[in-house]
């Protein structure tokens, strides 16, 4: 019998100066960047927290604190890879991941496939195991006012 664990992650970043946002490991042209200590990939941060949460291993801030200068500007894909390596070492593997990106802008439809492909590559899995969806808050709240981006992520881990 296969054992399973479920993890949920959530992250938010405000817009800042810049000409693109990193989402799901993909640079997406935009009038702003995201304010963050690392590269600000809010999607990979939420996904990292979901993976860690499934095994009660804390959160991304515990493993890669923003008070540590070595993580300034860090590639969130590398952080996710390190986290997933520890998941594999613990005897688990990804069943599936489901991410919902919440923002008014930028428009993400043209980038969803690339995000799914990149996340699947980072997690050494099939693209069909990764879902990325985008939605808005109908111009309500901070995302609706175009002040930032939020992401929810859920993962299912299976014992190996």
Curated annotation (Swiss-Prot):
A Pfam family of this chain: YgbB
GO molecular function annotations of the record: 2-C-methyl-D-erythritol 2,4-cyclodiphosphate synthase activity; metal ion binding
Pathway, per record: Isoprenoid biosynthesis; isopentenyl diphosphate biosynthesis via DXP pathway; isopentenyl diphosphate from 1-deoxy-D-xylulose 5-phosphate: step 4/6
Top-level enzyme category: lyase
Site (Transition state stabilizer): 37, 136
NCBIfam families for this protein: ispF (TIGR00151)
Name assigned to this protein: 2-C-methyl-D-erythritol 2,4-cyclodiphosphate synthase
Gene name per UniProt: ispF
